[in-house]
Amino acid sequence: MPHESSPDSQHEHGVAVEAARPEVAPPPFYQVMLLNDDYTPMDFVVDVLQQFFSMDLDKATQVMLHVHTRGRGVCGVFTREVAETKVAQVNEYSRMNQHPLLCTMEKA
């Protein structure tokens, strides 16, 4: 008696065996960090947080004050490609506006 097979299972002696599906690990995430400096105006930092990280004024102000008092702060957590893009955008925008504000990323 012929056995029928489907893409998801094989029949061996009347027992259905599901084909193994490869496990895919979730992508690693990275924190995008702003570093404090003594020259970049606070309102510029708030503008960066609103423009590049879609924060409202209250949240952007809170993060800016955290960066100012603690030396650095998290702007968001993203996949590597998104984090790299945001770091490059913020650093380029800061240089274009003649500010030394530095944005970095580290594994979350």
Curated annotation (Swiss-Prot):
The family this protein is said to belong to: Belongs to the ClpS family.
Subunit field text: Binds to the N-terminal domain of the chaperone ClpA.
Record SUPFAM superfamilies: ClpS-like
Coiled coil: none
Paired cysteines (S-S): none
Biased composition (Basic and acidic residues): 1-15
Protein name: ATP-dependent Clp protease adapter protein ClpS
Organism domain of life: Bacteria
BP terms from Gene Ontology: protein catabolic process; proteolysis
Function of the molecule: Involved in the modulation of the specificity of the ClpAP-mediated ATP-dependent protein degradation.
Region Disordered, annotated ranges: 1-22
